[in-house]
């Protein structure tokens, strides 16, 4: 085999290993994902209207039969401004000087007030027959900034903060097999702040974050402008349902936040001690204490652990499995995770189920890698050196800044991280003035051999 053939074989092998990781592991098929058909090719039609232009009550807006024929099509996940531009109410902000505040082409919230960008978002959905007799949950993963969540004429939750996800039990408020209505009233940030003129010069001379008042909110600080955004920030401060909303069902108990902590034995790095944790939720189903069993399985490794528990009405309980209690959680000669160009990105899968009286109530899964990361300054100039699984690694890092108007998708995220990997980058700093990224984003890190620093 000549050198060219060997090179092509290696290139295709690497390309295939990266390509094979582009499926969103977090998007389980047992959920209903309420993404819009506009821009996201989802299955749901969303409409939006400025709250001040709606005369009907919230109960009417969120009930079947309400007429939205004069409402605008909405992009969900997305923002108010994304949808307004999509409906050609305002010009494309990224084109020419359209977004310059002096142009007055797109109203800035600091001049027109919060009410101008306060909107209703509305859609209709069906609950499948398979959800009958179960607890039914509505999960908004991110709304900026405050929101009222209405289902079939009932206010079921209020959300405060851009990076808050919510778990809303809608069991008693939806009809299985029939149409239901979800209406979300979305409010902008409490303190929008104002943009400030940017003088040309060194980075330190720019007015990052406008007048600084945007920092009074827990939100995307760069939405008001930063030293890399010449065009004066985002006019609506990215108000909207910016992450997906999903619907799913569980039994009388629910599971959340499965996590695996790995500890490698040194100096051989040939023994791994795994600690598993998960949260159990009792959504006020019973007045009595419920007893059950939590089962954890590291798939394909013949490692299974079980633990009985009792939980009170409305309680959230954390259950932990340690290698001291369960010797099978000590793995000998584990397949280690390595960063790009240092070895394979081996990943394990954990599946956790919770059962009551032998019936499975809920199951969750997550993927994890086994690795050890350390650093020291034992160098002549006291510079920091990093080690992975005891091997010295040279850090090639970069900064990660989100798309300004939050126009993103799984396909775009995958492409951008793939390009980053192909550039030889092995560490990304998630800049604090941006967002809390999507689950899919972090999934790709593990599969591509890239670290992240927050």
Where are the regions a protein language model picked out?
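Beta-strand-rich binding/interaction modules
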Residues: 149-151, 270-312, 317-319
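Surface beta-strand/loop "capping" patches
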Residues: 251-285, 380-385
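Accessory beta-strand-rich segments of carbohydrate-active enzymes
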Residues: 23-33, 47-53, 57, 83, ...
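Bacterial Sec-dependent N-terminal signal peptides
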Residues: 1-26
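Internal, hydrophobic beta-strand segments that form the core of beta-sheet-rich folds
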Residues: 185, 340-355
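Short glycine/proline/serine/threonine-rich loop/turn segments at secondary-structure transition edges
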Residues: 131-134, 174-179, 192-194, 287, ...
């Amino acid at each position: 085999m000549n050198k060219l053939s060997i090179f092509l074989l290696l290139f295709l092998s690497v390309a295939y290993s990266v390509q094979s990781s582009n499926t969103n592991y977090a998007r389980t098929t047992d959920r209903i994902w309420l993404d819009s058909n506009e821009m996201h090719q989802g299955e749901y039609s969303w409409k939006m209207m400025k709250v001040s232009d709606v005369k009907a009550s919230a109960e009417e807006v969120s009930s079947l039969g309400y007429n939205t024929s004069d409402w605008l099509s909405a992009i969900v996940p997305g923002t108010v401004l994304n949808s307004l531009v999509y409906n050609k109410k305002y010009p494309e902000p990224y084109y020419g000087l359209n977004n310059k505040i002096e142009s007055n082409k797109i109203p800035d919230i600091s001049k027109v007030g919060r009410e101008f960008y306060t909107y209703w978002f509305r859609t209709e959905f069906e609950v499948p027959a398979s959800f009958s007799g179960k607890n039914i949950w509505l999960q908004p993963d991110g709304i900026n900034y405050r929101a009222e969540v209405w289902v079939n004429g009932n206010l079921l939750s209020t959300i405060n903060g851009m990076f808050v996800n919510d778990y809303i039990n809608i069991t008693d408020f939806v009809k299985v097999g029939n149409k239901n209505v979800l209406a979300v009233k979305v409010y902008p940030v409490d303190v929008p702040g104002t943009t400030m003129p940017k003088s040309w010069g060194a980075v330190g001379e720019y007015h990052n974050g406008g007048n600084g008042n945007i920092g009074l909110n827990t939100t995307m600080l760069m939405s008001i402008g930063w030293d890399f955004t010449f065009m004066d920030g985002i006019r609506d401060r990215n108000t909207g349902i910016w992450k997906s909303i999903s619907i799913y069902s569980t039994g009388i108990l629910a599971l959340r936040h499965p996590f695996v902590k790995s500890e490698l034995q040194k100096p051989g790095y040939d023994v791994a001690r795994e600690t598993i944790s998960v949260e159990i939720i009792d959504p006020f189903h019973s007045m009595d204490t419920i007893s059950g069993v939590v089962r954890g399985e590291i798939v394909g490794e013949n490692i299974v652990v079980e633990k009985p528990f009792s939980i009170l009405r409305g309680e959230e309980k954390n259950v932990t499995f340690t290698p001291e209690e369960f010797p099978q959680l000590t793995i000998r000669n584990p397949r280690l995770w390595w960063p790009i160009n240092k070895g394979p990105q081996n990943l394990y899968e954990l599946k956790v189920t919770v059962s009551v009286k032998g019936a499975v109530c809920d199951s969750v899964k997550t993927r994890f890698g086994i690795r050890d990361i350390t650093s020291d300054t034992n160098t002549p100039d006291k510079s920091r050196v990093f080690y992975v699984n005891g091997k010295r690694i040279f850090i090639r890092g970069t900064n990660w800044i989100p798309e300004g108007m939050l126009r993103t998708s799984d396909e775009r995220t995958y492409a951008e991280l793939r390009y980053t990997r192909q550039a030889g980058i092995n560490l990304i700093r998630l800049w604090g003035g941006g967002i809390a990224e999507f689950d899919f984003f972090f999934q790709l890190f593990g599969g591509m051999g890239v670290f992240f620093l927050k």
